Amino acid sequence: MGKPVVAVVGRPNVGKSTFFNYLAGSRISIVEDTPGVTRDRIYTEIEWRNTKFTLIDTGGIEPYSEDIIMQQMKRQAEIAIETADVIIFMVDAKDGMTATDKEVATMLRKSQKPVVLCVNKVDRVGDPPPDVYEFYNLGMGEMQIISSVHGLGIGDLLDEVFEHFPEDIASEEEEDVIKVAVVGKPNAGKSSLINSILGENRVIVSNIPGTTRDAIDTHVEKDGQKYTFIDTAGIRRRSKISENIEKYSTIRSWTAVERADVCLIMIDAEDGVTEQDTKIAGYAHQQGKASIIVINKWDLIEKQTGTLEEYRKVVHEKLGFMTYAPVLFISAKTGQRVIKIYELIKFVADQAAFRISTGMLNDLVSEAVAMVQPPSDKGKRLKIYYMTQIGVKPPSFVVFVNDVELFHYSYERYLENQLRKNFGFEGTPIRFIHRQREKEN
């Protein structure tokens, strides 16, 4: 399996977000200023006892009325329960045990997931007030007592969480297996596509959004290449519930993206590119994943000459950060063009793993600089000394220059275009790191 997922669950204002932010620390950073690249502080990767896991913050609900609070809390907890391997159930020592705490406890017991009870806002962790022991009445077993504000007791809490991780935590670096995440909003046809690819109904399909409850791995071999398809459940927006809940609709897709080598970003041809599609695609881009934009239900679109190319143009306009991704028009229901998917997956996976020698790279840089002069500012011009590739998946390059402040985004984009023109890299993002050094004599 991949990284374990730990969700922090509890009623509003018990300190979930404070706890999350304490653990996240400086590891949360704003990435590219690009539409669709999520900035929500909703989850982060934590490492404890040499094991990485994903921590989900289910906080941030604004209480409007008692009824709405209950709806939001229940929906939030449901999603966290479905997603998580281990749940931290947080309560507030200062408020004491409430009716809402009891309802959450009942819900968690029914889940049969491992739950660690965490009593927050205790200033003297080693000598807690007697009142905290009333939380034993929740029937959740032993409690961990912490102060998120002061960082007290958190190590013991994480030790307890660690004990509940599945035993089969292991690297997924299997030999020559391409892991494919099929992601998209509910009812875009993710399960239908996998069924069409496999030629059999391995995944229950229904036109009711959210039918697929959890991520399902399907292993298949085609022409000597092994693939693992990860089908992710979609969670439908509920109009009567606060828009804060919408953030959780892509949690499963995010965890699938993290595990994947290639992402198939499913878009409903009739709906076009929606805001939710943009967020999911943006996350795949942010994570450096090779991606294919799959326009499903193409058989339902009324077509004229040029319809396909015009649609492709609109897709790349709306997903402007992902113009490198090929767009495939299919019908999972009829099987139209589905046969092309294996070939395209293998192609973009190879592109993401492609390496270029430093010599070839610097020949390209010399030619690029000769064609378009680097930018200058106040009489000082950018000088590129050399470039070398430092990684794959995604292809990553370090560029050594005289002044990183002169390396404008527009010139970086120009170099990226030259790389793509000469070496391909279709379907994969490219990363640049700028390094400044003095010119050698």
Curated annotation (Swiss-Prot):
Domain KH-like: 354-438
One GO molecular-function entry: ribosome binding
Xref: CDD domains: EngA1, EngA2
Keywords, ordered alphabetically: GTP-binding, Nucleotide-binding, Repeat, Ribosome biogenesis
Domain EngA-type G residue range list: 4-169, 178-353
Residues the entry annotates as binding GTP 1: 10-17, 57-61, 120-123
Subunit and partners: Associates with the 50S ribosomal subunit.
Sequence similarity: Belongs to the TRAFAC class TrmE-Era-EngA-EngB-Septin-like GTPase superfamily. EngA (Der) GTPase family.
Protein name: GTPase Der
